[in-house]
């Protein structure tokens, strides 16, 4: 009986291969993987390297790639729209961090039944006055997170920081009382003395840390259990820090030329080089 059992085990492993319980079949799968998957791995690596090469499409992207725009403040000064997330990667660099705040399933009722997708909330920031929020819905979790990160980079805004009392050291808190709202959620921020820390719930605290604010008092009301509205209200609050002018900004404004006007020759030459030349027609006379 023992011999029969051994023979059956060998037969199962040899005949069924991948689906058998015998170890012989699994070993065969390993050999096959060594043959086929090794080549695939090389190809995948090549594709990734190709994707890393950024070819700018917009005028702003071409100026950033060429090094004519070196600071993100130049973009904010002229209110230029950012359409490529690689611009943020080049200007802010490795200091930009991201965190997934929440992934929630959402459903839509169709004739065939309920269609389930996943919604991701992602916050990005460098901890030095720049923060962004991205929301993306997709069939797969990984795709939703990847899309939310890209949207968060495209929505990066400057955050104005100030002092609670005397202007000693670096700015550490919000410049004044500011309120943000989304849905039923209202978030209010009040300047705090140095050393107070961020007095806030878990959700707005993470956003404020990414924005580079060290001390602030916060109060919130409404349905703060709805994390999406809570994050959006906090982000709206930080956006409004540059929404008005305080006395130190009442000085006469010095107008400067837009980067598009300064580097007109570069953009024109770039456009001419990318365009195809007209074919030369020879005379048959």
UniProtKB/Swiss-Prot annotation:
Q: Which InterPro entries match?
A: Ribosomal_Su5_D2-typ_SF, Ribosomal_uS5, Ribosomal_uS5_C, Ribosomal_uS5_euk/arc, Ribosomal_uS5_N, Ribosomal_uS5_N_CS, Ribsml_uS5_D2-typ_fold_subgr
What's a GO cellular component annotated to this UniProt protein?
cytosolic small ribosomal subunit
Ordered alphabetically, the record's keywords are:
Ribonucleoprotein, Ribosomal protein, RNA-mediated gene silencing
UniProt KW Ribosomal protein keyword:
yes
- The Basic residues compositionally biased stretches are 35-46
Region annotation (Disordered) ranges: 1-51
PROSITE patterns cross-referenced by the UniProt entry = RIBOSOMAL_S5, S5_DSRBD
Upon gene disruption, the observed phenotype is: Reduced DNA methylation in some of the targets of RNA-directed DNA methylation (RdDM).
Domain of life where this protein originates: Eukaryota
Q: Which GO terms describe its biological process?
A: regulatory ncRNA-mediated gene silencing; translation
Protein's gene: RPS2C
NCBIfam families, per database record: uS5_euk_arch
Q: Where is the S5 DRBM domain?
A: 96-159
Q: Name one GO molecular function term.
A: mRNA binding
Q: Which residues form a coiled coil?
A: none
Family per UniProt?
A: Belongs to the universal ribosomal protein uS5 family.
The entry's function note states: Component of the ribosome, a large ribonucleoprotein complex responsible for the synthesis of proteins in the cell. The small ribosomal subunit (SSU) binds messenger RNAs (mRNAs) and translates the encoded message by selecting cognate aminoacyl-transfer RNA (tRNA) molecules. The large subunit (LSU) contains the ribosomal catalytic site termed the peptidyl transferase center (PTC), which catalyzes the formation of peptide bonds, thereby polymerizing the amino acids delivered by tRNAs into a polypeptide chain.
User: Would I find DNA repair among this entry's keywords?
Assistant: no
Give the Basic and acidic residues compositional bias ranges.
1-19
Species of the source: Arabidopsis thaliana (Mouse-ear cress)
Identify this protein by name: Small ribosomal subunit protein uS5x
